């Protein structure tokens, strides 16, 4: 089985020595298969964003190891290969966009890799078409909506030809329309392009279609399974301050009222199918 990322006994503190801070990550053990769509959820301060930054060596474990395609992130000679394998998209697209024109921004990463101009042009066209932004290639980024900017930021990562994209709360600053645009793009890249997607989010509905959902609390993994397996644990999720998808919450309340309804219903379609039986 091909694991694109492995975390072994990973713990992390932001400061050590005399002023050592409490651990933000505590003995994390995870393995991600190539081609999966993985959602990582948790409330603010759970450690999910800190963990995301370990997946492309932006942060290094205080204890334990992270491997990207068997390359140890602590080994400096692998740094560029790791970051080309696992691209990171940040919460605020304005922090990731560096050029005055969309096309130039997407070309920035490949140019830094020393890729020939003709290949860069092909990559830019491919990346912008993949996220549905090719028609905006000549636009200045400040003329775009928040969702469009985030799609350009994702295109900039795609142009590097990563095998995995890690997205750290990419929809947190977007309106509902922008969120739908970005999530639709992410799903398309995973299903049609085979890119491994690791989505960090606090919007439960965004990971309903994931292959796997990981729930974090206080720097630890507390749940790990398919969306159905995770979201049926309504009381566990509520105890750590998380909501569940609205349809799952409805099913949970109906069960409490004595109605025999499956606890793992996630979508409106599943609810309608059950009611119509």
Curated annotation (Swiss-Prot):
UniProt-annotated location(s): Cell membrane
Pfam family, one: ABC_tran
Binding site for ATP: 42-49
Stretches of the chain forming a coiled coil according to its record: none
Membrane-topology descriptor: Peripheral membrane protein
GO cellular component: ATP-binding cassette (ABC) transporter complex
Tagged with keyword Thylakoid: no
SUPFAM superfamilies listed in its UniProt record: P-loop containing nucleoside triphosphate hydrolases
Chief location category: membrane
Cross-referenced SMART domains: AAA
Enzyme Commission code: 7.-.-.-
Keyword field: ATP-binding, Cell membrane, Membrane, Nucleotide-binding, Translocase, Transport
Domain named ABC transporter: residues: 5-243
Assembly, per entry: Forms a stable energy-coupling factor (ECF) transporter complex composed of 2 membrane-embedded substrate-binding proteins (S component), 2 ATP-binding proteins (A component) and 2 transmembrane proteins (T component).
Protein family per UniProt: Belongs to the ABC transporter superfamily. Energy-coupling factor EcfA family.
Matching PANTHER family: ENERGY-COUPLING FACTOR TRANSPORTER ATP-BINDING PROTEIN ECFA1, HEAVY METAL TRANSPORTER
Main function: ATP-binding (A) component of a common energy-coupling factor (ECF) ABC-transporter complex. Unlike classic ABC transporters this ECF transporter provides the energy necessary to transport a number of different substrates.
Protein name: Energy-coupling factor transporter ATP-binding protein EcfA1
Lineage of the species this protein comes from: Bacteria, Bacillati, Bacillota, Clostridia, Thermoanaerobacterales
Gene giving rise to this polypeptide: ecfA1
